[in-house]
Structures are given as structure tokens and as C-alpha cells.
Amino acid sequence: RSLKNFGENEIFLINVERKFLPFRKKFDYVLKTDNVPKIQRSLLKMPTKTAVIDDAGYILTNRYMREKGQVKNTFETYDNIGNDFWSLFEFIKAELPDDVIVYIIMHEETDDYNNTKLKMMGKVLEQKVCVEGMVSIALRCITDEEGHHFVTNSGGKDISKSPEEMFENLIIDNDLKVVDTAIREYYGI
């Protein structure tokens, strides 16, 4: 739903699970893959300044399911998956121009103590990398009787964070177009 207000030619959508969008719209620039090197090559050639990787968590899951019986050492599988995912984040930061924004959409999970974190696979990403620490902005989607919203900062129980004064409110509409505009205005890009 958060992509709904982008124009058809405003984003490059990387549709990891190759599924239909939850609203009536088709984007002009779509790549259906979960292959990290292919995603990286495509990001270099994309015709827009905004990309969305939805749902990036399935990059991890799909690779694990493909490789789980092929590798004798399960730890090697997790290491390979973790390295691929980490390298995607590093690539985005190092290889793309500063005015290109890549939104990485993922699911979350909540533990027994009500702490919410990104849903990861393997201890490398959960304990060693801290994916949310690799980004400046992490918004969390919540749902209530009024609809879907983004949380812009955390009270310590989840990963929501954004720069000081980027957003006026703690809770904002679940509209990535509005978020994109706010980020570009904040950083002057």
C-alpha cells in the first residue's frame, strides 16, 4: 500500500516474490528476481532515482530453501546468505549516486519481551551485522482501526529511526511517496 501514490514511472520496483501488488496499479519499471548480483546490476542501470525492493526478506528465505540440501555444511549456507545480503547494502551505499534512494521492505518479528526486529535468517545477520544499523532511516508499518501508518522513531522496543526533524510526527501515513519527498527535501537531493 505504501507505494500506491508513486506515479507509474517514478520507481524501479524489484519484486522479489513476483507477486501482484495489493492495489490497482502497474509500474513501468519492474524486475522480478531474488538474485542479489542481478539486483545490483539492475540498480546501476535503473531509469529512476527511487527503487523499492519488496520483500527483501525473501532474498534470504528463497536462497536458503534452494541451497539447504545442496551444501554439506549448514553454517556455510548461512554465511553465504548473510554475505550476499550484507553486500547488497554495502553496494547500495557505495555504488549508487547520493540522490538515489533504495527502499528495502521487510517483515518483522516480535520476541517474548515485545521487542520487534527485522525478520532475518541465521546468526550472522542477526548478531554480527545488525542490518538496521547500516541505514539512516528505518520506518515500521503499524495497523490500527484507522488504517496503516509508519512509525518514524522508536521508544527502544523496535528499530524505527529517522533523523531529527525529518518528520513532524512520530506516526505518519503509510505513504512512501510522502516519505520520499520528505527525505529528498531534508537532504536537498
Residue spans for each PLM region:
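Conserved P-loop
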Residues: R1-I53, G57-Y58, N62
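A general structural signal for short secondary-structure junctions and capping/turn motifs
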Residues: S2-N5, A94-L96, K128-E132, I142
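Short, well-ordered beta-strand core segments
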Residues: I11, V102, A138-R140
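Generic beta-sheet signal
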Residues: I14-V16, I105, C141
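Structured loop/turn residues at beta-strand edges in well-structured enzyme cores
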Residues: M46, D98, G133
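P-loop NTPase motor core
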Residues: D55-C130
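Conserved GTP-binding G-domain of TRAFAC-class P-loop NTPases and closely related GTPase folds
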Residues: D111-I189
